[in-house]
Amino acid sequence: MDFREFLRQGFVVLDGATGSNLQQAGMESGDCPEQWIAEHPEVFIDLQCRYIEAGSDVLYTPTFTCNRIKLDEYGLASKQEELTKTLVGLTKEAIRRSKADRKIYVAGDVSMTGQQLEPIGSMPFEELVDVYKQQVRLLAKEGVDLFAIETMMSLQECRAALLAVKETCDIPALVTLTYQEDGRTLYGTSPETALVVLQSMGADAIGINCSTGPDKMVDAVKAMAKYACVPLVVKPNAGLPFLQDGVTCYDMDAESFSEAMMPLVDVGATVLGGCCGTTPEHIQKLVSRLKEKKAREIPVSYTHLTLPTTPY
């Protein structure tokens, strides 16, 4: 089934965290995640196999910052194509090994470059679009089913990434931003503003990930639901982080996380997963609770204006 059609069939379950689980497995904070995963493939494949077993319908490729700007910080910009091929291949290998009796969709993960756009920074908008186009082309070449543009702090950067997808291919795209405690992005954008802009640009699903736990996302999802003609996405952290014996932990176990996700379903979220601190157990508990819920019906989007006519 085409992913756009699948999106409107009911709940879609995403995977959970990658980075926090790999840190538990030995990845250091200063490592290039893409290179570390390429050098430790079995750790990553095992994690994604466990997400499939837990009930995830969509796996994110470990290409979060596999763009030429971020890779250049590690002296790896020349290896972007090689790394992309390897990393998408690991997700496909996890699907193959799982022998799942359902289709598992591969999401090409795209995120921030770390560069500031003009006029705050020095990067022209058109150059950022070009950076994302390069990453999008490489992911599309490897056969991803959709793009996950995620953990974005700037609506302008979201626009650049989504434009890159739209001008390169006809592959679906989910877009999620992070919001602060005041309910706005770092640059002051409200959830409903982001929804309206990205929806008008053709994003296939829009929402929130990272930054907070599920209990802090309800108001934002409720605000977006008033204007949404696309599915709404939530991928929260497992609550708040804290240090224990020098290790970052999160305060929501699988049971409390899945319980806190249900109010998000009640206000309209239908595409659900986990971000920092979540594990396959968190996803498994979420899937169990979703069996008791009915997904919000997605309103039909009107692409033209129809005016009443009066006979003369």
Each predicted region: which residue ranges?
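Single conserved hydrophobic/aromatic residue that forms the stacking wall/gate
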Residues: H304-Y312
